[in-house]
């Protein structure tokens, strides 16, 4: 093996797994708010658009500051930035929960509630974005050109897994209180920060003679169509995730019982829906995709059709079991569509550029979640079923594009 093919700053498999677990914790901590905060903030007196505005403003700040935190990671060390990011996320979420509890208790009312929650949530967008660029940079230095795409792809997959585990985990913790799922994610974030602090080696300087892979431009003609495709996909996902807890609350009109409050019932049933989605993803991923390794060009339109069908059925059929089954279908489709879209994006460039392509494609989910939740909340205020049908329409258009355009493009040889 040539020196140029050796990792610049190698990490053991265990250390890489710890970074992956931190990405899972980050994904869970970001998406749990759609299950818990959305219905409770509305109960505190905020409108749907105000709730989405708080989360959207924070997500926009988060996405805009990722490059800045990447430069800080290069200057002060990847480990320091990753540990700081996990603790910042846990602590800012803790302060946000306390502010929300104050609003629910009536200590803060009216427009003051919106400004308090928005101000507290902004600190998440300011302080927490460092994990993703620092982890990507650390994985880039810890891999060779041959293993880089797989390493960076693993980080993106971990973030996606976390985004599903967060809402699904609410099913387990909701019986202990409507806010318990967020407390669980806070403990997860802080624990991940401690593991990063103890498991990763001290910050090491990169060899002066080494050069990092040149990043791809966003408008690179080979990758941009795949980036735009994934942005549209996660834009649609964001519309539904933001509004699903409201949809379940307004449709089924839960009432309090001797064993649980109406708020706990909303969080529990929303968590069940997302748990079914997670089950569909796991079964499809490990029961079909992994053992058979199908052509991504063929499974992409099929997966998108599954997702679109699930969204339509979620509104068309009333019983909760049918909604849960619809989300299971969505999960099956997502397990086909997302890995296929990412794989096609990575394969669109030369082998030595695949790591850079994977890092660029990883920007699609947070970018989609900047606009999707706010648009979804606006549509929901007009008609509760509009986000589901709009998302289904977006998925249908993407499926048609994948069938007529993407499926006819040749795969770049690996």
Task: Please place each PLM-identified region on the residue numbering.
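C-terminal ends and interior cores of transmembrane alpha-helices
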Residues: 87-110, 305-318
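Transmembrane alpha-helices of Major Facilitator/SLC transporters
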Residues: 62-64, 269-292
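Helix-loop boundary and gating motifs at the non-cytosolic
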Residues: 9-59, 225, 234-257
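C-terminal transmembrane helical hairpin of 12-TM major facilitator-type secondary transporters
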Residues: 296-341
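Cytoplasmic helix-loop-helix junction between adjacent transmembrane helices
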Residues: 120-159
């Amino acid at each position: 093996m040539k020196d140029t093919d050796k990792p610049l700053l190698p990490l053991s498999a265990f250390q890489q797994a710890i970074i992956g677990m931190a990405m899972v914790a980050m994904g869970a901590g970001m998406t749990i708010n759609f299950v818990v905060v959305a219905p409770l903030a509305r109960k505190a007196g905020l409108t749907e658009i105000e709730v989405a505005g708080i989360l959207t403003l924070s997500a926009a700040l988060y996405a805009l500051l990722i490059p800045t935190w990447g430069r800080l990671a290069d200057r002060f060390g990847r480990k320091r930035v990753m540990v700081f990011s996990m603790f910042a996320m846990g602590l800012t979420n803790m302060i946000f929960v306390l502010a929300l509890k104050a609003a629910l208790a009536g200590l803060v009312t009216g427009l003051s509630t919106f400004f308090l929650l928005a101000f507290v949530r902004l600190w998440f967008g300011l302080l927490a974005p460092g994990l993703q660029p620092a982890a990507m940079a650390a994985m880039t230095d810890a891999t060779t050109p041959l293993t880089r795409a797989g390493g960076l792809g693993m980080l993106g997959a971990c973030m996606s897994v976390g985004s599903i585990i967060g809402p699904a985990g609410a099913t387990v913790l909701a019986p202990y209180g409507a806010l318990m799922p967020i407390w669980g994610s806070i403990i997860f974030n802080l624990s991940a920060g401690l593991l990063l602090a103890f498991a990763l080696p001290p910050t090491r300087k990169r060899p002066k003679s080494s050069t990092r892979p040149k990043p791809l431009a966003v408008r690179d003609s080979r990758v941009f169509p795949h980036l735009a495709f994934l942005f549209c996909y996660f834009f649609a996902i964001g519309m539904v995730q933001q509004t699903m807890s409201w949809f379940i609350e307004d449709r089924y009109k839960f009432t309090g019982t001797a064993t649980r409050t109406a708020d706990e019932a909303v969080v529990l049933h929303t968590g069940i829906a997302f748990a079914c989605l997670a089950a569909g993803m796991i079964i499809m991923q490990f029961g079909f995709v992994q053992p058979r390794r199908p052509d991504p060009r063929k499974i992409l339109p099929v997966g998108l059709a599954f997702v679109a069908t699930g969204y339509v059925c979620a509104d068309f059929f009333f019983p909760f079991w049918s909604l849960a089954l619809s989300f299971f279908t969505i999960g099956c489709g997502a397990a086909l569509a997302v890995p296929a879209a990412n794989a096609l994006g990575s394969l669109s460039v030369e082998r030595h550029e695949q790591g850079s392509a994977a890092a660029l494609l990883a920007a699609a989910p947070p970018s989609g979640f900047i606009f999707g939740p706010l648009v979804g909340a606006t549509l929901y205020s007009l008609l509760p079923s509009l986000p589901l049908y709009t998302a289904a329409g977006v998925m249908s258009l993407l499926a048609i594009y994948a069938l007529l355009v993407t499926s006819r493009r040749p795969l770049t040889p690996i």
